[in-house]
Amino acid sequence: MGNAVEPIPLTVNIAVLKPLCARANKPGANVEPQVQLEETQMTGSAGRILTTHAGSLPRSEALRDLVFARAEGKPYDKQQLAAELRTEVHDVVRRQFACGLDSVNDGELGKTNFTNYVRERLTGFEARPSEGGTGRRPLSIAGRDLKKFPEYFAAGGHGFGGFAGSGPSRSQVYCVAPLKYAGHDALKEELAIFKAALAGVSVAEAFLPANTPGTIEHWLRNEHYPSEEAFLHGIADAMREEYRAIVEAGFLLQIDDPDLPDGWQMYPDMSVVEYRRYAELRVEALNYALSGIPREKIRLHVCWGSFHGPHENDIPLRDIVDIVFKVRAASYSIEASNPRHEHEWRVFEDVRLPEGAMLIPGVIGHCTDFIEHPELVAERLVRYAKLVGRERVMAGTDCGLGPRVGHAKIAWAKLEALVEGARLASRELWGRG
């Protein structure tokens, strides 16, 4: 395609990194990595538990204001935004590297939320004042909890960390024409900035997230396509351009799909059988969009909406895990450390991973500002490793930490705990480290 970006060279061997977060104790600090390297072949978990995270990382208030101004159509300084993005992405890549993370990204520093993502990347829609939830589609990803705990939500107890779904909806986005991808320039800039930031940094993986058709559908109401299936495939046709461009640029594609679990809350009247049909349809559309992309270039991230709330009515992982594993991915990142879902490691006592696939359980959470103890992180990783195999586990986070914890330093401290916990788990599982 005309907007393809030249692939980046990533090392075939990976570096076993010693955590250096102490050198990067200020968010956004320009840290030049200086590490001792121990070359190992990148096979399975490379003789230890590798580490990654789910996407969003802290950014400065100045950059946040510029990014939101662009997304909301407000005046902003384009040159200042470009300069801030280049600087902060450069710094956040090095900060991840210094922490000892093996699989890094751009921190999603240039993105805002799912609704604005649709507005910036697609055409064929229009925004109109919200109808207050009338019509077929519920608007709350906490819908079942809302029915049981209306007083809690009425009191404002439903923070989203400034991410998608926070606050009252001022407008609703309607699909009124064939959906087309229009994010070529924004994506080209995003890829180029990340590529430049990686120069001189040796990592196991460099990944970029993109949203699934099902997740995008959350924030669009269909007034154009003749059926639900046609609508989903319309989104898939548009978004496959972004998916392919990310992979063609040399990056791992992370598909963010909170839709698979959190759609259950959006449709409170569905039975599990009905919801499984709902989820199957969206996986079919996603796999259609991913067709032609090598499976080993794809990882899937699923979570239960990441809002701060009761989550009592989340669908159990066991009810949908087989559908999750139908997504054509080489690794599966699953929220797994919060108080509602941590017990679900037992699902893997009798559920097998797809052949050759990796599991990335969230062992660090965003639902609390408590810093997880590295020994707790290690315990969580060892549990999974004993069930699916130590070579098939990678340490991850429940969701993006950037907008969901109380301060940037908390997010980075959590990632320090992640890396140290993985080191402790590796020592137990391999008898070294």
Language-model segment annotations:
Residues 32-433:
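Domain-level signal for soluble alpha/beta catalytic cores
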